[in-house]
């Protein structure tokens, strides 16, 4: 019999709540094609170009979440406040994602891949210009809308439009009231933190699945990466980077922070009061979780 003191995990609850949708977001045919060396350079280039724009939205959202965090005024006596830990994680994420963009550029140059939307292969020079909406993947448009509301619920994406199915729903889910969360809301940063954890966890699991498929192919003695349709960019460079133990530790660190913070809110509550608090938290995040998974699923190009 489970102990009555067993800690409830919000992140594990979310992962198990939408299993089929999560699977479709992390085990897509695009990933399998990449793992098997069948992904053409033009399709990989399109995805990389969109993922680079995702990085830019991620950076803006991280800044918004940092600005919204109310850091403690008192010096901690033991463990640092969850808000301080979250700020540390976001700062670490910003450093990592800038390194990631430089990695994109380096690999794209070495494998002759395009990382600018509308430009299939690296040009000698290109002037900065606005990206045509129709060239963005549906998942990127949804993620830009999701990120626009992080840490600032009254804000909606200036790029939103009824032309793209689901964007209005995304904005309504990730936008609460014009005044933002109530000052008495438990963990007012929770939705923003879960957005970052959710997108990073999907990325980790997606590329870890691709790595497992690539290893199956390698163990069967099939062709070397140099003969892959993308020249080996995914199997030699990207897949190992995005399925590393270091990346897994980084993602797990935020998941643990979230679960520990929620456990702190539930601590001392029993019976109906504890269950009501759980339901209040789930009411804030479950719809957003599903919407995030839909965006992640639609971020992969058709192959």
Regions found by a protein language model. Name each.
Residues 2-31, 246-253:
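Acidic, low-complexity proline/glycine-rich segments
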Residues 15-39, 263-272:
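Short alpha-helical hairpin
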Residues 19-24, 39-69, 96, 194-205:
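Alpha-helical bundle segments that constitute or directly flank the non-heme di-iron/ferroxidase center
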Residues 26, 54-61, 100-103, 169, ...:
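Amphipathic, well-ordered alpha-helical segments in soluble domains
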Residues 29-42, 59-88, 185, 216:
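Helix-loop segments that flank and shape redox-cofactor active sites
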Residues 80-250, 294:
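Active-site-proximal alpha-helical scaffolds that flank and shape metal-associated catalytic sites
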Residues 235, 239-281:
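Extended, basic/helix-rich recognition subdomains
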Residues 264-272, 277, 283-303:
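A cross-kingdom marker for long, charged
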């Amino acid at each position: 019999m489970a102990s009555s003191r067993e800690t409830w995990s919000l992140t594990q609850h979310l992962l198990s709540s939408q299993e089929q949708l999560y699977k479709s977001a992390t085990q897509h045919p695009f990933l399998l094609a990449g793992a098997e060396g069948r992904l053409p350079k033009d399709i990989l280039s399109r995805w990389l170009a969109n993922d680079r724009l995702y990085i830019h939205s991620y950076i803006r959202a991280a800044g918004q979440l940092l600005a919204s965090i109310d850091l403690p005024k008192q010096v901690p006596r033991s463990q640092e406040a969850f808000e301080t830990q979250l700020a540390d994680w976001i700062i670490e994420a910003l450093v990592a994602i800038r390194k990631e963009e430089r990695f994109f550029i380096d690999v794209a140059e070495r494998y002759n891949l395009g990382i600018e939307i509308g430009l299939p292969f690296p040009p000698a020079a290109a002037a900065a210009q606005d990206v045509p909406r129709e060239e963005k993947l549906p998942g990127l448009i949804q993620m830009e809308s999701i990120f626009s509301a992080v840490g600032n619920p009254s804000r909606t994406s200036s790029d939103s439009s009824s032309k793209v199915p689901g964007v209005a729903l995304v904005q309504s889910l990730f936008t609460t009231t014009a005044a933002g969360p109530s000052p008495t809301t438990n963990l007012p940063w929770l939705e923003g933190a879960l957005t970052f954890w959710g997108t990073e966890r999907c990325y980790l699991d997606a590329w870890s699945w691709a790595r497992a498929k690539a290893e199956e192919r390698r163990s069967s003695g099939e062709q070397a990466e140099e003969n892959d349709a993308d020249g080996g960019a995914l199997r030699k460079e990207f897949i190992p980077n995005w399925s590393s133990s270091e990346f897994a530790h980084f993602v797990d660190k935020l998941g643990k922070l979230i679960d520990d913070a929620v456990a702190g809110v539930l601590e001392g509550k029993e019976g109906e009061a504890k269950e009501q608090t759980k339901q209040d938290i789930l009411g804030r995040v479950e719809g957003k979780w599903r919407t995030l998974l839909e965006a992640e699923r639609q971020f992969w190009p058709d192959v």
